[in-house]
Amino acid sequence: MKVLLVSPLPPPNGGMATWTEQYLRDSDGVNNVYTVNTAFIGERALHKGRKIKILPEIKRMASIMGSYLKILHTQSIDVIHINSSCSKTGILRDALCVAFANKKHLVFHCHCNIQDQLKGRLATKLGKYIFNRADCVFVLNKASFAYVRGLSRTQVRMIPNAIAHDLIASKYSVSDELRNIVYVGHVKIKKGICEIIEAARSEKDIKFHLIGPIADEIKQIHSPENVVFYGRKTHEEAMKMMKMADAFLFPSYTEGFSMVMLEAMAAGLPIIATDVGSNADMIEIKGGVVIKPQSSNEIVQAIENIRPQKVRAEMSKWNLHKVKSSYRDDAVFKQIQEVYHEICVPDLESD
């Protein structure tokens, strides 16, 4: 089967880029995949979309559309699979890709909490247009599922992010005391960094390790000595540092289905995460503590709840089991393959 995948590749690293690499590995020998790379370029690659300059963005859009149209005109594509963050500029590009799809079978994959992204009349209209045109829409969580259902009658599937089975730890050695808590991701206000800093003022016996590119807005905040900023690290470096921690803290204000949180679960770490996106569905009530967004007090209380070694050991064991049973890459990839074949059945039968 020939698949045209419209999706970012690293650099820079990110949730969708990691997903794309994983998909290409799993597709090897199964699908013939043609990839159109939608990754940020220039300053946007360095600042993860914070700075948008018109000319570089026009150049990027032209390059993406040029590659997309060339593949469509030179290859007999069976399925177009578009990965999207549903951002303001991204949804416009996605709509253009859909408009030029030439009646090809289409899977639109939303890597976000859709209702948090499609704000405003134009974005909503573009989203509805794409949903109606797609053969199937993939979403990450229940809220996004309901949102698409409210706009379109298109088939909707909840497809979780996945992790390579060889990256799932066989076991995790739980320390006697809770001394090191790690956060991995963009270090900015909307990721709950201010709340981490405030919680650290109360939990002085714990070190908070913050790994990821640091926004200017955070650099101006005075933080206590037990908060350590590491800046941007490679994926391998970040994962190595994560595995040395006693717990993973993820107080983001909004989320789809966090790859880094999935990686923390696969490492066997107990989780403290906000009730946004798929976070609560992932750890349920046994893999960690779910807290309200923008509450340093709840972070402090959650930390106290997981201090006992026995509690953290049970959470670790449960998270490893959950990842193995629900998020292995081979199982998730099989679901995607099944959808491809379902939407292409009429064509295959006519052949």
Where does each model-flagged region fall?
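Conserved donor-binding/catalytic core segment of Leloir-type glycosyltransferases
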Residues: 4-5, 163, 173-191, 197-203, ...
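Donor nucleotide-sugar binding/catalytic pocket of nucleotide-sugar-dependent glycosyltransferases
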Residues: 132-169
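Nucleotide-activated donor-binding/catalytic signature segment of Leloir-type glycosyltransferases, i.e.
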Residues: 218-236
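Short alpha-helical donor nucleotide-sugar binding micro-motif in glycosyltransferases
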Residues: 232-233, 240-245
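Aromatic "clamp/platform" in nucleotide-sugar-dependent glycosyltransferases that forms part
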Residues: 253
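Short hydrophobic beta-strand element within catalytic cores of glycosyltransferases
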Residues: 270-273
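Conserved acidic donor-binding segment of nucleotide-sugar-dependent glycosyltransferases
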Residues: 285, 289-296, 305-310
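A short, well-ordered alpha-helix in the C-terminal region of glycosyltransferases
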Residues: 311-326
